[in-house]
Protein backbone atom coordinates (compact mmCIF):
# COMPACT_ATOMS: atom_id res chain seq x y z
CA UNK A 1 0.00 0.00 0.00
CA UNK A 2 1.43 3.38 -0.99
CA UNK A 3 1.47 6.35 1.36
CA UNK A 4 -1.05 8.09 -0.90
CA UNK A 5 -3.41 5.10 -0.78
CA UNK A 6 -3.06 4.91 2.99
CA UNK A 7 -3.96 8.59 3.30
CA UNK A 8 -7.09 8.05 1.23
CA UNK A 9 -8.05 4.96 3.20
CA UNK A 10 -7.59 6.87 6.45
CA UNK A 11 -10.31 9.34 5.59
CA UNK A 12 -13.59 8.91 7.48
CA UNK A 13 -16.18 7.06 5.47
CA UNK A 14 -18.98 9.48 4.71
CA UNK A 15 -22.35 8.59 6.12
CA UNK A 16 -25.03 9.17 3.51
CA UNK A 17 -27.25 10.32 6.38
CA UNK A 18 -24.88 12.80 8.06
CA UNK A 19 -25.58 16.37 6.95
CA UNK A 20 -23.15 19.27 6.97
CA UNK A 21 -24.62 22.77 7.22
CA UNK A 22 -22.26 25.53 6.13
CA UNK A 23 -23.11 29.16 6.91
CA UNK A 24 -21.31 31.52 4.52
CA UNK A 25 -20.87 35.28 4.72
CA UNK A 26 -18.80 37.71 2.67
CA UNK A 27 -15.50 37.97 4.49
CA UNK A 28 -13.18 40.23 6.42
CA UNK A 29 -9.43 40.83 6.73
CA UNK A 30 -7.61 38.37 8.98
CA UNK A 31 -5.98 41.23 10.89
CA UNK A 32 -5.52 44.98 10.92
CA UNK A 33 -2.74 46.59 8.93
CA UNK A 34 -1.82 47.26 5.33
CA UNK A 35 -0.92 43.73 4.20
CA UNK A 36 -3.83 41.74 5.71
CA UNK A 37 -6.31 44.28 4.34
CA UNK A 38 -4.54 44.29 0.97
CA UNK A 39 -4.76 40.49 0.73
CA UNK A 40 -8.46 40.61 1.51
CA UNK A 41 -9.20 43.40 -0.96
CA UNK A 42 -7.18 41.70 -3.69
CA UNK A 43 -9.14 38.47 -3.35
CA UNK A 44 -12.45 40.32 -3.17
CA UNK A 45 -11.84 42.71 -6.05
CA UNK A 46 -10.30 40.01 -8.25
CA UNK A 47 -13.61 38.11 -8.26
CA UNK A 48 -15.15 38.44 -11.73
CA UNK A 49 -18.61 38.26 -10.16
CA UNK A 50 -17.79 41.42 -8.19
CA UNK A 51 -15.97 43.37 -10.91
CA UNK A 52 -16.60 42.23 -14.48
CA UNK A 53 -14.38 44.82 -16.15
CA UNK A 54 -12.09 43.18 -18.75
CA UNK A 55 -8.96 41.91 -16.99
CA UNK A 56 -6.54 43.84 -19.21
CA UNK A 57 -8.20 47.04 -18.06
CA UNK A 58 -8.91 46.06 -14.46
CA UNK A 59 -5.53 44.50 -13.52
CA UNK A 60 -3.49 47.73 -13.61
CA UNK A 61 -6.28 49.71 -11.93
CA UNK A 62 -6.50 47.17 -9.12
CA UNK A 63 -2.83 46.43 -8.58
CA UNK A 64 -1.24 49.79 -9.35
CA UNK A 65 -3.84 52.16 -7.93
CA UNK A 66 -6.45 50.61 -5.62
CA UNK A 67 -4.20 48.14 -3.80
CA UNK A 68 -1.54 50.77 -3.18
CA UNK A 69 -3.85 53.35 -1.60
CA UNK A 70 -7.04 51.75 -0.31
CA UNK A 71 -5.68 49.16 2.21
CA UNK A 72 -4.31 51.79 4.60
CA UNK A 73 -7.56 53.76 4.57
CA UNK A 74 -9.68 50.62 4.95
CA UNK A 75 -7.50 49.39 7.82
CA UNK A 76 -8.14 52.62 9.71
CA UNK A 77 -11.87 52.14 9.21
CA UNK A 78 -11.66 48.56 10.46
CA UNK A 79 -9.85 49.78 13.57
CA UNK A 80 -12.98 51.66 14.61
CA UNK A 81 -15.12 48.50 14.68
CA UNK A 82 -12.48 45.84 15.48
CA UNK A 83 -13.17 43.28 18.21
CA UNK A 84 -9.86 43.71 20.04
CA UNK A 85 -10.64 40.92 22.48
CA UNK A 86 -10.77 38.32 19.70
CA UNK A 87 -8.60 40.29 17.26
CA UNK A 88 -11.20 40.08 14.51
CA UNK A 89 -14.01 42.06 12.93
CA UNK A 90 -17.61 41.83 14.20
CA UNK A 91 -18.59 39.98 11.02
CA UNK A 92 -16.40 37.05 12.01
CA UNK A 93 -17.43 37.18 15.68
CA UNK A 94 -21.14 37.17 14.95
CA UNK A 95 -21.04 34.60 12.13
CA UNK A 96 -19.20 32.21 14.46
CA UNK A 97 -21.86 32.82 17.10
CA UNK A 98 -24.62 32.13 14.57
CA UNK A 99 -23.02 28.78 13.72
CA UNK A 100 -22.54 27.90 17.39
CA UNK A 101 -26.13 28.77 18.26
CA UNK A 102 -27.44 26.78 15.30
CA UNK A 103 -25.34 23.80 16.40
CA UNK A 104 -26.73 24.22 19.91
CA UNK A 105 -30.28 24.10 18.55
CA UNK A 106 -29.45 20.82 16.84
CA UNK A 107 -27.91 19.30 19.96
CA UNK A 108 -30.98 20.31 21.97
CA UNK A 109 -33.16 18.35 19.55
CA UNK A 110 -34.91 21.20 17.74
CA UNK A 111 -34.17 19.53 14.40
CA UNK A 112 -34.92 16.02 15.60
CA UNK A 113 -31.70 14.51 14.22
CA UNK A 114 -29.10 15.17 16.90
CA UNK A 115 -25.60 14.16 15.90
CA UNK A 116 -26.52 13.57 12.26
CA UNK A 117 -26.08 17.29 11.52
CA UNK A 118 -22.73 19.09 11.66
CA UNK A 119 -22.61 22.90 11.52
CA UNK A 120 -19.66 24.95 10.29
CA UNK A 121 -19.11 28.46 8.94
CA UNK A 122 -16.97 30.12 6.31
CA UNK A 123 -16.20 33.37 4.54
CA UNK A 124 -16.27 33.80 0.78
CA UNK A 125 -13.06 35.83 1.01
CA UNK A 126 -10.21 35.36 3.51
CA UNK A 127 -10.70 32.97 6.45
CA UNK A 128 -12.11 30.57 7.43
CA UNK A 129 -12.24 29.70 3.74
CA UNK A 130 -14.99 27.72 2.08
CA UNK A 131 -12.39 25.11 1.11
CA UNK A 132 -11.16 24.57 4.67
CA UNK A 133 -14.71 24.39 6.04
CA UNK A 134 -15.78 21.84 3.42
CA UNK A 135 -12.69 19.80 4.26
CA UNK A 136 -13.75 19.75 7.92
CA UNK A 137 -17.23 18.57 6.95
CA UNK A 138 -15.75 15.77 4.88
CA UNK A 139 -13.44 14.78 7.74
CA UNK A 140 -16.51 14.48 9.97
CA UNK A 141 -18.13 12.05 7.55
CA UNK A 142 -20.78 14.25 5.96
CA UNK A 143 -22.37 12.77 2.85
CA UNK A 144 -24.79 15.66 2.36
CA UNK A 145 -24.03 19.38 2.52
CA UNK A 146 -26.38 22.36 2.76
CA UNK A 147 -24.80 25.69 1.81
CA UNK A 148 -26.40 28.67 3.56
CA UNK A 149 -25.39 31.97 1.92
CA UNK A 150 -26.37 34.59 4.47
CA UNK A 151 -27.66 36.96 1.79
CA UNK A 152 -31.46 37.43 1.88
CA UNK A 153 -31.49 38.93 -1.62
CA UNK A 154 -29.80 37.12 -4.53
CA UNK A 155 -26.99 38.85 -6.41
CA UNK A 156 -24.43 37.41 -8.76
CA UNK A 157 -21.71 39.23 -6.82
CA UNK A 158 -22.67 37.48 -3.57
CA UNK A 159 -24.86 34.37 -3.80
CA UNK A 160 -23.54 33.20 -7.15
CA UNK A 161 -19.96 33.91 -6.14
CA UNK A 162 -20.42 31.59 -3.16
CA UNK A 163 -21.71 28.87 -5.50
CA UNK A 164 -18.66 29.36 -7.74
CA UNK A 165 -16.29 28.97 -4.80
CA UNK A 166 -18.09 25.90 -3.48
CA UNK A 167 -17.82 24.21 -6.89
CA UNK A 168 -14.16 25.17 -7.21
CA UNK A 169 -13.41 23.84 -3.71
CA UNK A 170 -15.21 20.54 -4.28
CA UNK A 171 -13.28 20.06 -7.52
CA UNK A 172 -9.99 20.65 -5.70
CA UNK A 173 -11.02 18.14 -3.05
CA UNK A 174 -12.20 15.60 -5.63
CA UNK A 175 -15.35 15.26 -3.52
CA UNK A 176 -18.99 15.21 -4.53
CA UNK A 177 -21.47 14.95 -1.65
CA UNK A 178 -25.18 15.46 -2.17
CA UNK A 179 -25.58 19.23 -2.29
CA UNK A 180 -28.28 21.79 -1.57
CA UNK A 181 -28.17 25.56 -1.23
CA UNK A 182 -30.59 27.85 0.58
CA UNK A 183 -32.37 30.05 -1.99
CA UNK A 184 -32.90 33.79 -1.45
CA UNK A 185 -35.31 34.47 1.40
CA UNK A 186 -36.03 38.13 0.66
CA UNK A 187 -39.82 37.62 0.88
CA UNK A 188 -39.98 34.88 3.49
CA UNK A 189 -42.61 35.80 6.11
CA UNK A 190 -40.33 34.74 8.98
CA UNK A 191 -37.57 37.04 7.72
CA UNK A 192 -39.95 39.96 7.14
CA UNK A 193 -41.53 39.49 10.56
CA UNK A 194 -38.09 39.39 12.23
CA UNK A 195 -37.11 42.61 10.49
CA UNK A 196 -40.35 44.30 11.52
CA UNK A 197 -39.96 43.26 15.15
CA UNK A 198 -36.34 44.39 15.13
CA UNK A 199 -37.24 47.79 13.68
CA UNK A 200 -40.03 48.30 16.21
CA UNK A 201 -37.69 47.41 19.08
CA UNK A 202 -34.95 49.62 17.70
CA UNK A 203 -37.25 52.60 17.33
CA UNK A 204 -38.75 52.07 20.77
CA UNK A 205 -35.26 52.18 22.30
CA UNK A 206 -34.50 55.63 20.87
CA UNK A 207 -34.91 58.81 22.87
CA UNK A 208 -36.37 60.54 19.82
CA UNK A 209 -38.95 59.77 17.15
CA UNK A 210 -37.44 59.68 13.64
CA UNK A 211 -39.26 61.61 10.95
CA UNK A 212 -37.71 59.27 8.38
CA UNK A 213 -36.81 55.59 8.72
CA UNK A 214 -34.54 54.99 5.76
CA UNK A 215 -33.95 51.50 4.31
CA UNK A 216 -30.46 51.10 2.83
CA UNK A 217 -29.31 48.10 0.79
CA UNK A 218 -25.82 47.48 -0.55
CA UNK A 219 -25.66 48.70 -4.12
CA UNK A 220 -24.42 46.96 -7.26
CA UNK A 221 -23.65 48.40 -10.70
CA UNK A 222 -26.81 49.21 -12.63
CA UNK A 223 -25.43 47.30 -15.62
CA UNK A 224 -25.60 44.04 -13.63
CA UNK A 225 -29.34 44.49 -13.14
CA UNK A 226 -29.81 45.43 -16.79
CA UNK A 227 -28.06 42.16 -17.67
CA UNK A 228 -30.64 40.19 -15.68
CA UNK A 229 -29.53 40.16 -12.04
CA UNK A 230 -32.72 40.01 -9.88
CA UNK A 231 -31.14 41.81 -6.93
CA UNK A 232 -32.91 45.15 -7.38
CA UNK A 233 -36.37 43.60 -7.68
CA UNK A 234 -35.78 41.47 -4.58
CA UNK A 235 -34.62 44.49 -2.57
CA UNK A 236 -37.72 46.41 -3.63
CA UNK A 237 -39.94 43.50 -2.60
CA UNK A 238 -38.29 43.22 0.82
CA UNK A 239 -38.74 46.97 1.27
CA UNK A 240 -42.41 46.81 0.21
CA UNK A 241 -43.26 43.89 2.49
CA UNK A 242 -41.46 45.47 5.43
CA UNK A 243 -43.21 48.81 4.94
CA UNK A 244 -46.56 47.08 4.80
CA UNK A 245 -45.81 45.20 8.03
CA UNK A 246 -44.75 48.45 9.73
CA UNK A 247 -47.53 50.51 8.09
CA UNK A 248 -44.96 53.03 6.80
CA UNK A 249 -45.45 55.08 3.64
CA UNK A 250 -42.67 55.32 1.01
CA UNK A 251 -42.15 58.93 2.13
CA UNK A 252 -41.65 57.93 5.78
CA UNK A 253 -39.53 54.93 4.80
CA UNK A 254 -37.56 55.60 1.58
CA UNK A 255 -35.39 53.02 -0.20
CA UNK A 256 -31.72 53.73 -1.00
CA UNK A 257 -28.50 51.95 -2.01
CA UNK A 258 -25.09 52.40 -0.43
CA UNK A 259 -21.38 51.54 -0.87
CA UNK A 260 -20.98 52.47 -4.51
CA UNK A 261 -17.47 51.94 -5.82
CA UNK A 262 -15.80 53.35 -8.92
CA UNK A 263 -17.20 55.59 -11.64
CA UNK A 264 -19.92 53.35 -13.09
CA UNK A 265 -23.57 54.10 -12.38
CA UNK A 266 -24.88 52.01 -9.49
CA UNK A 267 -28.38 51.36 -8.22
CA UNK A 268 -29.96 54.54 -6.94
CA UNK A 269 -31.03 56.61 -5.13
CA UNK A 270 -27.71 56.66 -3.29
CA UNK A 271 -27.86 56.51 0.49
CA UNK A 272 -25.30 59.24 1.17
CA UNK A 273 -26.88 61.69 -1.25
CA UNK A 274 -30.37 60.98 0.09
CA UNK A 275 -29.27 61.51 3.70
CA UNK A 276 -27.81 64.92 2.80
CA UNK A 277 -30.82 65.91 0.70
CA UNK A 278 -33.33 65.02 3.41
CA UNK A 279 -31.41 67.04 5.98
CA UNK A 280 -31.27 70.02 3.63
CA UNK A 281 -35.04 69.74 3.14
CA UNK A 282 -35.63 70.03 6.86
CA UNK A 283 -35.60 66.46 8.21
CA UNK A 284 -34.00 66.65 11.65
CA UNK A 285 -34.41 63.13 13.02
CA UNK A 286 -33.57 59.97 11.09
CA UNK A 287 -33.06 56.25 11.66
CA UNK A 288 -31.49 53.87 9.13
CA UNK A 289 -31.79 50.10 8.81
CA UNK A 290 -29.87 47.77 6.50
CA UNK A 291 -31.98 44.63 5.96
CA UNK A 292 -29.75 43.17 3.24
CA UNK A 293 -26.96 42.60 5.77
CA UNK A 294 -27.43 39.61 8.06
CA UNK A 295 -24.59 40.81 10.30
CA UNK A 296 -23.37 44.27 11.22
CA UNK A 297 -20.04 45.02 9.57
CA UNK A 298 -17.91 47.85 8.20
CA UNK A 299 -20.64 48.89 5.76
CA UNK A 300 -23.23 49.27 8.49
CA UNK A 301 -21.34 50.28 11.64
CA UNK A 302 -18.85 52.61 9.97
CA UNK A 303 -20.35 53.64 6.63
CA UNK A 304 -23.88 54.21 7.93
CA UNK A 305 -23.39 54.69 11.66
CA UNK A 306 -20.42 57.06 11.36
CA UNK A 307 -19.99 58.47 7.83
CA UNK A 308 -23.66 58.96 6.98
CA UNK A 309 -24.39 60.27 10.45
CA UNK A 310 -21.76 62.96 9.79
CA UNK A 311 -23.29 63.74 6.39
CA UNK A 312 -26.70 64.15 8.02
CA UNK A 313 -25.50 66.40 10.84
CA UNK A 314 -23.33 68.54 8.55
CA UNK A 315 -26.32 69.09 6.24
CA UNK A 316 -28.53 70.30 9.09
CA UNK A 317 -29.82 67.12 10.73
CA UNK A 318 -29.83 66.76 14.50
CA UNK A 319 -30.48 63.17 15.60
CA UNK A 320 -29.46 60.03 13.74
CA UNK A 321 -29.60 56.34 14.67
CA UNK A 322 -28.51 53.07 13.07
CA UNK A 323 -30.88 50.18 13.78
CA UNK A 324 -28.77 47.01 14.21
CA UNK A 325 -28.92 44.08 11.83
CA UNK A 326 -30.55 40.86 12.98
CA UNK A 327 -27.09 39.46 13.79
CA UNK A 328 -27.09 36.54 16.26
CA UNK A 329 -30.09 37.89 18.18
CA UNK A 330 -33.05 35.68 19.00
CA UNK A 331 -34.85 37.10 15.95
CA UNK A 332 -31.83 36.58 13.72
CA UNK A 333 -31.40 32.99 14.85
CA UNK A 334 -35.10 32.33 14.32
CA UNK A 335 -34.63 33.25 10.65
CA UNK A 336 -31.54 31.05 10.25
CA UNK A 337 -33.15 28.07 11.97
CA UNK A 338 -36.23 28.50 9.80
CA UNK A 339 -34.45 28.59 6.44
CA UNK A 340 -32.12 25.74 7.41
CA UNK A 341 -34.94 23.55 8.74
CA UNK A 342 -36.98 24.17 5.59
CA UNK A 343 -34.14 23.20 3.25
CA UNK A 344 -33.25 20.09 5.26
CA UNK A 345 -36.68 18.55 4.68
CA UNK A 346 -36.26 15.09 3.22
CA UNK A 347 -32.72 14.80 4.55
CA UNK A 348 -33.53 14.53 8.25
Swiss-Prot record:
Keywords assigned: Cytoplasm, Heme biosynthesis, Iron, Lyase, Metal-binding, Porphyrin biosynthesis
Reactions catalysed, as given in the entry: heme b + 2 H(+) = protoporphyrin IX + Fe(2+)
Pathway(s) annotated for this protein in UniProt: Porphyrin-containing compound metabolism; protoheme biosynthesis; protoheme from protoporphyrin-IX: step 1/1
Database matches in InterPro entries: Ferrochelatase, Ferrochelatase_AS, Ferrochelatase_C, Ferrochelatase_N
Pfam families registered for this protein in UniProt: Ferrochelatase (PF00762)
A GO term for molecular function: metal ion binding
Coiled coil (residue ranges): none
Subcellular compartments: Cytoplasm
Single GO BP term: heme biosynthetic process
This enzyme's EC code(s): 4.98.1.1
CC per GO annotation: cytoplasm
Similarity remark: Belongs to the ferrochelatase family.
Function: Catalyzes the ferrous insertion into protoporphyrin IX.
Name of the protein this chain belongs to: Ferrochelatase
Provenance organism: Methylocella silvestris (strain DSM 15510 / CIP 108128 / LMG 27833 / NCIMB 13906 / BL2)
Source species taxonomy: Bacteria, Pseudomonadati, Pseudomonadota, Alphaproteobacteria, Hyphomicrobiales
Amino acid sequence: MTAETAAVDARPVASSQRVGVLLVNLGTPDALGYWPVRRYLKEFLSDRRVVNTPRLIWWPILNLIILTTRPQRSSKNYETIWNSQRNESPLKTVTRSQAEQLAGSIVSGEFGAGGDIVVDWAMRYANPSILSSLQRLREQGCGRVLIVPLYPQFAGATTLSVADKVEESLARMNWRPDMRSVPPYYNDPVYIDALAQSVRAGLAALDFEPEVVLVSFHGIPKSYVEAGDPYYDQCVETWRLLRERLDFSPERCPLTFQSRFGRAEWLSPYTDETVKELARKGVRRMAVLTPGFSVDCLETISEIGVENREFFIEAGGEQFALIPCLNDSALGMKVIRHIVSRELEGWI
